[in-house]
Amino acid sequence: MAEQDLGGMPLHEAARAAGVQFHEDAIPSSGFVEANGLRFHYLEWGKPTDRPIIMLHGMGQTAHSWDFAALALCDRYHIVALDQRGHGDSDWAPNAEYSLSAHQGDIAAVLSELGLDDIVLMGLSMGGRNAFTYAADYPAQVAALIVVDSAPELQQSGADTIRRFVENMDVLDTFEEFVVKTKQYNPRRSDRQIRGSLTNNLKQLPDGRWTWKYDRVFRSPDAKPWTSPDIVAQMWHKVEGVQCHALVVRGAGSTVLSQKTAEEMAQRLPNGRLAVVPDAGHLVPGDNPTGFHQVVEAFLADIPL
């Protein structure tokens, strides 16, 4: 099928438009690694000799969700943004195995294969849950933790809004339909920013229609992972077991993570603190890239690394 011009803004142009400060030669390399029985794709930025920051995206997203953050940080840090199982260009899991333990196994195996240790672990939403549970269980590997708009308990209304959005956009006839519906869902983003994001998140089917790259089991009406009371209680226990310095980041306009739960999250983390980013919803790094970068930089500068 012929390649199409989908109207997305080139990364550096989009970053400048969003006010992101970066070095002009900052571009990622794309790699693959066999780990935990699957083939994982990742984007790598910066020098391997610098402190590694591992970035874990949210449900339905890809490693490119972190492009702005990686651009801003890669002059001082070695960034590895991972396509988690079932997402982006990584393998889908056999038998739809997307449990917390499976994700933890992935992170451990990827770090081992890439020779990474003493990391800063950063995760958004689903990736945030994977990050704080991993930090609790592998304390020797995680020097610092950044959890973005995520906690053991989320606001059901906001989570349901996201689920309706993805369920109603399983397969559409044109790329333009995805652009229009995404703009309605997140009016904070410009059309060109949305196009750039969708270029990385969608794939074209042989019949010419478009769909999401990630495993459709995530957008099944029956898919409600990690919401049972037992699992929520287990995750709060994990939060209390995180030993490293930790930052909780909430978008001021988030309908997914409440201010009350964000405050509880920061309080129950033994070395936790909270930052609220204005002009941002759930997808904080893309909604307000400069605001997100400011709170991350302030945190990293204030802790012993």
Task: Describe each region flagged by the PLM.
Residues 33-38, 43-45, 67-74, 81-122, ...:
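Active-site loop/oxyanion-hole signature of alpha/beta-hydrolase fold enzymes
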Residues 1-51, 75-77, 116-117, 297-305:
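Alpha/beta-hydrolase fold catalytic core
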Residues 117-156:
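Conserved hydrolase catalytic core segment
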Residues 50-58:
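Short beta-strand element of the alpha/beta-hydrolase
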Residues 271-305:
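Catalytic active-site module of serine/aspartate enzymes centered on a nucleophile-bearing elbow/loop
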Residues 205-267, 273:
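Conserved serine/cysteine hydrolase catalytic core
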Residues 2-10, 150-214:
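Helix-rich cap/lid subdomain of alpha/beta-hydrolase
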Residues 58-61, 125:
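Active-site glycine-rich loops that stabilize anionic/oxyanionic intermediates
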